[in-house]
From Swiss-Prot:
The lineage of its organism: Bacteria, Pseudomonadati, Pseudomonadota, Gammaproteobacteria, Enterobacterales. PROSITE patterns: BON. GO terms for biological process: chaperone-mediated protein folding; hyperosmotic response. Induction: By elevated osmotic pressure in the growth medium. It comes from Escherichia coli (strain K12). SMART domains: BON. Residues 55-123, 134-201 form the BON domain. It holds the Pfam family BON. GO terms for cellular component: outer membrane-bounded periplasmic space. This is Osmotically-inducible protein Y.
């Protein structure tokens, strides 16, 4: 009777140990699977973020290109940003019609889900005053640089600036002086082009 009980006890102990090992293995396996799934989700999330960033960058580039190609839109004053395929246009345009056209162009780009219009219409009078002030400053800077130059006889050179276009007139001693004056004018910030009407003696 005692031996029988002992055998039963050993059998129960063996069953309990086997069950515990199996349970532990199953727990470890489930835990490992959960960890792997979590890591996989993090990787997927990171990949999605990278993918979205790449998509947004591509959309921004396409919108900018589309605006540049449009003849009626001055794209240099328009800023383009894209976040999760939503494009935001900001900056200045010449008219409300131009702003509406810019939004229309952006909406037509592949991948764009919506467009946020934060464009401002520039005041024509304000732009004119700024343009005049800019031309005056450009003329003054060119005159100062010509005066400081040892080659160009600045007292004989007249400088006029209109919308960033500089006109040089007057008389110099040689073609070298004429070329030098033109080079100095072109190097000044804000100058779009130089019309050299200088005459040589």
């Amino acid at each position: 009777m005692t031996m029988t009980r002992l055998k039963i006890s050993k059998t129960l102990l063996a069953v309990m140990l086997t069950s515990a090992v199996a349970t532990g293995s199953a727990y470890a396996e489930n835990n490992a699977q959960t960890t792997n799934e979590s890591a996989g989700q993090k990787v997927d999330s990171s990949m999605n973020k990278v993918g979205n960033f790449m998509d947004d960058s591509a959309i921004t580039a396409k919108v900018k290109a589309a605006l540049v190609d449009h003849d009626n839109i001055k794209s240099t004053d328009i800023s383009v940003k894209t976040d999760q395929k939503v494009v935001t246009l900001s900056g200045f345009v010449e008219s409300q019609a131009q702003a509406e056209e810019a939004v229309k162009v952006a909406k037509g780009v592949e991948g764009v889900t919506s467009v946020s219009d934060k464009l401002h219409v520039r005041d024509a009078k304000e732009g004119s005053v700024k343009g005049y002030a800019g031309d005056t400053a450009t003329t003054s800077e060119i005159k100062a640089k010509l005066l400081a130059d040892d080659i160009v006889p600045s007292r004989h050179v007249k400088v006029e600036t209109t919308d960033g276009v500089v006109q040089l007139s007057g008389t110099v001693d040689s073609q070298a002086q004429s070329d030098r004056a033109e080079s100095i004018a072109k190097a000044v910030d804000g100058v779009k082009s130089v019309k050299n009407d200088l005459k040589t003696k």
